[in-house]
């Protein structure tokens, strides 16, 4: 009798715990999470240390590296929580996925307008250079980069990564090996692109402080580089979720959003290559 009581008690308590964790409504109610404030603090460290590095402070580069490590770590942990909520706790119902899709599309639209503001600043100076710039673009004394060397190579690399991620998208879910190989190829190409971008920055004949050309160039390409870093993390999380059998025919929203984000990064780079490297140089 006592064993039966204990068994019923355990069953009732387990049922209560499961009912608390399983979502019974279609609304996206987020739980308390430390990651938004952690990501915000990491971005603050990256911003401040970036300014310190530009100003020549001795510990600026160290703090910048520390900030990037903190940003990548907190984003990874945040992705882990989102995967748990969507895959194991059932929080991402079809209604919630609709809302998340709309929110992500609006986020990409806001990013489009951010890049429009950067291109606006570039073309504002390039189309009507002032007397202080020598009434000429590029400004007098600026030695620009050859667009047919590293920039062209990076263009080929990034477009190739767009092709491999599209292959992974179309391989899902019937060809799991194709998804894995496509994502691995995309991540490798993204890493190579970032490496060449850093090589280009290191060997560039001008700096961020070299007038409006240097500031707009590094702002445009650097902000795009940050998006490449975020997209690489996004795709890496998608790869780990594929390897962990998290994705199904009807439940792979994060995977699709990562692909959409990567295509956005591809398109922005094409505009950067044509306008900043080729036409503006």
UniProtKB/Swiss-Prot annotation:
Keywords: Membrane, Mitochondrion, Mitochondrion inner membrane, Translocase, Transmembrane, Transmembrane helix
Record field: transmembrane: 34-54, 59-79, 103-123, 148-168, 179-199, 220-240, 259-279
UniProt xrefs under InterPro entries: Cyt_c/ubiquinol_Oxase_su3, Cyt_c_oxase_su3_dom, Cyt_c_oxidase-like_su3, Cyt_c_oxidase_su3-like_sf, Cyt_c_oxidase_su3_a-hlx
Broad class of where this protein is predominantly found: mitochondrion
Membrane topology classification: Multi-pass membrane protein
Top-rank taxon: Eukaryota
Subcellular location(s) of the protein: Mitochondrion inner membrane
A single cellular component GO annotation: mitochondrial inner membrane
Reaction(s) catalysed (UniProt annotation): 4 Fe(II)-[cytochrome c] + O2 + 8 H(+)(in) = 4 Fe(III)-[cytochrome c] + 2 H2O + 4 H(+)(out)
Role this protein plays: Component of the cytochrome c oxidase, the last enzyme in the mitochondrial electron transport chain which drives oxidative phosphorylation. The respiratory chain contains 3 multisubunit complexes succinate dehydrogenase (complex II, CII), ubiquinol-cytochrome c oxidoreductase (cytochrome b-c1 complex, complex III, CIII) and cytochrome c oxidase (complex IV, CIV), that cooperate to transfer electrons derived from NADH and succinate to molecular oxygen, creating an electrochemical gradient over the inner membrane that drives transmembrane transport and the ATP synthase.
UniProt record similarity statement: Belongs to the cytochrome c oxidase subunit 3 family.
Protein name per Swiss-Prot or TrEMBL: Cytochrome c oxidase subunit 3
